[in-house]
């Protein structure tokens, strides 16, 4: 065997026929770290690092998929990862992998430069974002998921106490199926505006006073929080379905309070 001979053809084992006749719903690569850029609500771009999962459907008669082509797709991709760009990336993956169905998921930290409510000092706050694109039966669906840290203050504690009320950091997680491109900041603002108070990376004493009093004047159970965010998502025509979660890391318990609302607007009577 002379590998240097230009007439030598290396065997392609993965392209051979598989006799077990068993299709694989999803096969591909996971946990690939690769840089990407996303577009902010102001139209600027933000560089970050994504953790990618890419897979396709494999027919029953095909022994293996083309694993290297998933990474090649990431190397060839460029430009901000908008919803439209994500759909185009999905189509390119299916073409490269010669597949009829597939899925791309990327998770990354996203930073927002926020201004403190009183002092005006600016600081970054990070959010966990996941974009998912899925093609099945000729239908392409795109999802945006964001985890938003906020503050919640207990209405019951406020009502029964002579002074003060227990409060804690909470997580609001919005996983929305998109009908149109929705900036990440839009989902973040919905969650923050419906919480007892939002968070900032840096606060001065006047800001801390504002945050404390703002939360005290706006108490919410985890049920209130998830319902108020859900109303906002229901009113947004760019969102066709969602899974919404709220979790309060209770400061007076060693457990969390949790609520979930799941809704598909297409199934309404």
From Swiss-Prot:
Q: Which domain of life is it from?
A: Bacteria
Under the heading InterPro entries, the entry gives: GTP_cyclohydrolase_FolE2, GTP_cyclohydrolase_FolE2/MptA
Top-level EC class, please? hydrolase
- Which EC numbers does the record give? 3.5.4.16
Mind listing the GO biological process terms from this record? tetrahydrofolate biosynthetic process
The site feature described as May be catalytically important is recorded at: 154
Q: Name one Pfam family in it.
A: GCHY-1
Q: Identify the metabolic or biological route this protein is part of.
A: Cofactor biosynthesis; 7,8-dihydroneopterin triphosphate biosynthesis; 7,8-dihydroneopterin triphosphate from GTP: step 1/1
Q: Tell me which UniProt keywords the record has, alphabetically.
A: Hydrolase
Catalyses: GTP + H2O = 7,8-dihydroneopterin 3'-triphosphate + formate + H(+)
Which function does this protein serve? Answer: Converts GTP to 7,8-dihydroneopterin triphosphate.
UniProt cross-references to PANTHER family, sorted A to Z: GTP CYCLOHYDROLASE MPTA (PTHR36445:SF1)
What is stated as this protein's family in its record?
Answer: Belongs to the GTP cyclohydrolase IV family.
Q: What is this protein called?
A: GTP cyclohydrolase FolE2
């Amino acid at each position: 065997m002379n590998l240097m001979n230009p007439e030598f053809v290396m065997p392609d084992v993965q392209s051979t026929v598989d006799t077990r006749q068993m299709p694989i719903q999803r096969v591909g690569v996971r946990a690939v770290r690769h840089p990407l850029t996303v577009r902010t609500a102001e139209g600027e771009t933000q560089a970050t690092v994504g953790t990618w999962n890419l897979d396709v459907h494999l027919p029953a008669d095909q022994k293996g998929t083309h694993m290297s082509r998933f990474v090649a797709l990431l190397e060839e991709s460029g430009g901000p990862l908008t919803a439209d760009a994500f759909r185009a990336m999905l189509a390119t993956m299916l073409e490269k992998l010669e597949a009829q169905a597939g899925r791309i998921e990327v998770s990354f930290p996203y930073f927002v430069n926020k201004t403190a409510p009183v002092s005006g000092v600016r600081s970054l706050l990070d959010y966990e974002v996941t974009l998912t694109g899925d093609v099945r039966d000729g239908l392409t669906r795109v999802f945006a998921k964001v985890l938003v840290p906020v503050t919640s203050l207990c209405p019951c504690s406020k009502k029964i106490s002579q002074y003060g009320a227990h409060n804690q950091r909470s997580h609001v997680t919005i996983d929305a199926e998109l009908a149109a491109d929705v900036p990440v900041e839009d989902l973040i603002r919905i969650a923050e505006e419906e919480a007892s108070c939002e968070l900032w990376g840096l606060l001065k004493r006047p800001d801390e006073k504002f945050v404390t009093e703002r939360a005290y004047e706006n108490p919410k159970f985890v049920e209130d929080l998830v319902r108020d965010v859900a109303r906002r998502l229901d009113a947004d025509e760019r969102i066709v379905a969602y899974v919404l979660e709220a979790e309060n890391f209770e400061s007076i318990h060693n457990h969390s309070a949790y609520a979930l609302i799941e809704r598909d607007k297409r199934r309404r009577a």
